[in-house]
Regions:
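Active-site loop-to-helix "anion-binding N-cap" substructures in soluble metabolic enzymes
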Residues: 2, 7, 12, 17, ...
Length: 288
C-alpha cells in the first residue's frame, strides 16, 4: 500500500514532539532506568462538556508528577482541538486512536496522520486489538500506518497481543512476534527507535481472566529481545502494558523490569483512577 505526499497548498506545522525514552546503549537499556509513560485510550467515549473537566483535572494532577513520568491521552479525533486547547502548555500530550494508511485522497471517513499533526498531537495508536478484530486490520496495514505516523512526526503506539485461543495453544510469542516483526521490517533502526509498543493480551480483557505481572513481564521481555535484534537503540523502545490496568494492580505491573508504563482504557475516563495509575508509575521510578 503506497501513499502519495502531502496535499499541495497545505502549510503544515510540525507535530508536537512526543516524550521519548532516554537515549542509552543496549546494556543500560536492559536496566530499569527508562522513564515511565502512561497513556489514556478513551476509545469511543466522551462529549465536549464532560471532556473539559476530565482533561483539566488530568493536566492539574500531572503537574505534580516527577519529570520521569510522562502522561498522554488519546482522544476520539473530533476532540483533538479541545484536547489541544486545554492541554497545551501542560505536562500532558495528546493523540488519536487510529490513523489512515493514506496521506490524502478519496477515502471517505479516513483521517490522515498529517491532519492529526495539525493539532500538535504527539501520539497515534495503531493496530489496537479492537481495530484488528472489528475492522480486520492486517499486520501489513498496521505496519503501513506506523510509517504514516512517523512521516507526520507522530509517535505511533503499536499494539500487539494474542487471543485466549492463541495463548492456550502456546502461540503467544509466535503471534506477537509476527505482529511486531511486520512493523519492524518496514522501518530503519532509526525509525524503529521512535515507536512505542503496547502489549495488550486480548484474552485478559473482558474475559474474567487476568494476566499476572509475571505473565506480562515474560511477554514484554520477549518483545524487548525482538526489538534489540533490530539494533541497540531500538532495545530502548518504551513498552506499555494494556491489559486492564487499574489503580490496584498498576504498581505491581509497572515494577516489572520490562514494563515501562501502561495504555489505559476504562480507567482513563475517571481522572482519579487515571492519576492514581500515574502515581503508581511514579512510585516505581522512585524505587529504582
Amino acid at each position: 500500500m503506497h501513499a502519495k505526499g502531502a496535499r499541495k497548498g497545505c502549510t503544515r506545522k510540525p507535530a508536537a514532539k512526543a516524550p521519548q525514552a532516554d537515549d542509552k546503549g543496549q546494556d543500560e537499556t536492559m536496566s530499569t532506568q527508562r522513564a515511565k509513560l502512561v497513556v489514556g485510550n478513551w476509545k469511543m467515549h466522551g462529549c465536549l462538556a464532560d471532556n473539559a473537566g476530565l482533561l483539566q483535572a488530568v493536566a492539574k494532577g500531572a503537574a505534580e508528577l516527577p519529570a520521569d513520568v510522562r502522561v498522554g491521552v488519546c482522544v476520539p479525533s473530533p476532540y483533538l482541538a479541545q484536547a489541544q486547547s486545554l492541554l497545551e502548555g501542560s505536562r500532558v500530550v495528546w493523540g488519536v486512536q487510529d490513523i489512515s494508511a493514506f496521506t490524502h485522497g478519496a477515502y471517505t471517513g479516513e483521517v490522515a496522520a498529517q491532519m492529526v499533526a495539525d493539532f500538535s498531537a504527539a501520539f497515534a495508536i495503531v493496530g489496537h486489538s479492537e481495530r484488528r478484530a472489528y475492522h480486520r486490520e492486517s499486520a501489513e496495514l498496521v505496519a503501513v500506518k506506523t510509517q504514516r505516523a512517523l512521516e507526520a512526526g507522530l509517535t505511533p503506539i503499536v499494539c500487539v497481543g494474542e487471543t485466549l485461543q492463541e495463548r492456550e495453544a502456546g502461540s503467544t510469542e509466535q503471534v506477537v512476534g509476527v505482529q511486531l516483526d511486520e512493523v519492524l521490517a518496514k522501518l530503519s533502526a532509526e525509525e524503529a527507535a521512535r515507536i512505542v509498543v503496547a502489549y495488550e493480551p486480548v484474552w485478559a480483557i473482558g474475559t474474567g481472566k487476568s494476566a499476572s505481572s509475571g505473565q506480562a513481564q515474560a511477554v514484554h521481555a520477549f518483545l524487548r529481545s525482538r526489538l534489540a535484534a533490530k539494533g541497540a537503540s531500538v532495545a530502548n523502545v518504551t513498552l506499555l502494558y494494556g491489559g486492564s490496568v487499574k489503580p490496584d494492580n498498576a504498581e505491581e505491573l509497572f515494577s516489572q523490569r520490562d514494563i515501562d508504563g501502561g495504555l489505559i482504557g476504562g480507567a482513563s475516563l475517571k481522572d482519579q483512577d487515571f492519576l492514581a495509575i500515574c502515581k503508581a508509575a511514579a512510585a516505581t521510578t522512585a524505587a529504582t
